[in-house]
Amino acid sequence: MPIEGKYKLEKSDNFDKFLDELGVGFMVKTAAKTLKPTLEVDVQGDTYVFRSLSTFKNTEIKFKLGEEFEEDRADGKRVKTVVNKEGDNKFIQTQYGDKEVKIVRDFQGDDVVVTASVGDVTSVRTYKRI
């Protein structure tokens, strides 16, 4: 099944602790916890585009597998990032900076399970295709 499409956040576990460990400020954390963002995935040849859309903030990363790029992390810091693919449907994103963050997006049919880790804190968020 192709991964392109739109997915809505259905379930979020431990996301507030993940944001705490990352050092996200109170106002941003409060807003982020209450939102139900839409994940939009687009594939343009060998370039992938992942967008997170919400009423509070929209973000986008555009990348080619294995190629380093820069992005603004959730705490506002500019970091170097690399995304690799494992199998057909699992994308492993590593953000390098003062803290290393790993974000795994596992596309499972109509669901995307996003596991984000920083330090010894892990958050799991599940999105459903819309």
From Swiss-Prot:
Q: Is Ribonucleoprotein among the key words of this record?
A: no
Q: Where in the cell is it found?
A: Cytoplasm
Residues that coordinate or bind (5Z,8Z,11Z,14Z)-eicosatetraenoate: 105, 125-127
Single annotated GO MF: lipid binding
List UniProt keywords, sorted A-Z.
Allergen, Cytoplasm, Lipid-binding, Transport
InterPro entries, per the entry: Calycin, Fatty_acid-bd, ILBP, Lipocln_cytosolic_FA-bd_dom
Query: Would the keyword Transport turn up in this protein's UniProt record?
Result: yes
Residue stretches in coiled coil: none
Under the cellular component aspect of Gene Ontology, which terms does the record hold?
Answer: cytoplasm
Binding residues for (9Z)-octadecenoate: 105, 125-127
Q: What is known of its domains?
A: Forms a beta-barrel structure that accommodates hydrophobic ligands in its interior.
Similarity remark: Belongs to the calycin superfamily. Fatty-acid binding protein (FABP) family.
Report the protein's function: FABPs are thought to play a role in the intracellular transport of long-chain fatty acids and their acyl-CoA esters. Binds the natural fluorescent fatty acid cis-parinaric acid and oleic acid by competition, but not retinol, retinoic acid, cholesterol, dansylated or anthroxylated fatty acids such as dansyl-DL-aminocaprylic acid and 12-(9-anthroyloxy)-stereate.
Q: Any idea what this protein is called?
A: Fatty acid-binding protein
Q: Which organism is it from?
A: Blomia tropicalis
